[in-house]
Curated annotation (Swiss-Prot):
A Gene Ontology term for the protein's cellular component: plasma membrane
UniProt key word rRNA-binding: no
NCBIfam families, sorted: membrane protein insertion efficiency factor YidD
Major site of localization recorded for this protein: membrane
Pfam families to which the protein is assigned, alphabetical: YidD (PF01809)
Family named by the database record: Belongs to the UPF0161 family.
Name the UniProt record assigns to this protein: Putative membrane protein insertion efficiency factor
Record key words, sorted: Cell inner membrane, Cell membrane, Membrane
Subcellular localization(s) per the UniProt record: Cell inner membrane
Function summary: Could be involved in insertion of integral membrane proteins into the membrane.
SMART domains in UniProt: Haemolytic
Transcription regulation found in the keyword field: no
Length: 78
């Protein structure tokens, strides 16, 4: 992981440890949005991983889908 990825994953981890316990479980998906964000950034890099995480967070609301939604695999052609 490069420095940008480490910083972003670290920020998500701080959220998971400091804020998430106080807010309670709100996510409609498995894995949770924060776990999805960490995995997306680790797999796809800081820019694309952040974009995937932001799209996922935008879908995590009442009236949208729910359930199992894994991070897409890395396309080896790119």
């Amino acid at each position: 992981m490069n420095l940008a990825q480490k910083c972003l994953v670290g920020a998500i981890r701080v959220y998971q440890l400091a804020l998430s316990p106080w807010l309670g479980r709100q996510c409609r998906y498995l894995p949770t949005c924060s776990e999805y964000g960490k995995e997306a950034i680790e797999k796809h890099g800081a820019l694309k991983g952040s974009w995937l995480a932001a799209k996922r967070i935008g879908r995590c609301r009442p009236g949208c889908s729910h359930g199992y939604d894994p991070v897409p695999p890395v396309d080896p052609r790119k």
